[in-house]
Amino acid sequence: MAGGQDERVVFAASVEALLRAFGPPWKPGAREALLKLGIDPEQAPRAAYPLSLYMQLLAALGEIHFPDAIEDERYFQMGQAFIRGFERTLIGRAQLSLLQLIGPRRTLDRLTRSFRNANNYTTANLRELAPKHFEIEFGFVQIPGFYRGVLDAGLRAVGANDLSVELAKREALAATFTVRWT
């Protein structure tokens, strides 16, 4: 997929969300790790980044900020931090304000559209199992723990209480999560 229009990319808002989640001020080694990846936190983000670079960014920041966490928990915490950082971006504030008005149920209806502000490849199929109990299948997930953290923090931010987000199934690069709240 190198170089073509089918290349998976992550948009600036996603990189900006991670940067705002973790700095400044930067933990020792964080700024250097970013610069090594070609990301200068003092400069405006590029419009888009290759998915492979974003995965390296997640790994580097995760190891610096959550060094003692096992991998799945580290990425869960990264997903939660992503939402905290997203709330600090212009697009994030606007999007989360709208989603707070419509609540968790209708937020899930808009999931693919919301993820399209983050990247060019995420699709989500939603299935209602019962009121406030859903199954969400994502077509391409490299790090399920990260998605679980994003869903957890994102749904809490728009009003879901007593929330549970669990990985229900993993097939190739697809991942299915169950989500329920009160």
Regions found by a protein language model. Name each.
Residues 26, 32, 41, 106, ...:
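Polar low-complexity intrinsically disordered regions enriched in Ser/Thr and small residues
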Residues 1-69:
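N-terminal leader/assembly segments
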Residues 39-145, 167-169:
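Amphipathic interaction/junction segments at domain boundaries or subunit interfaces
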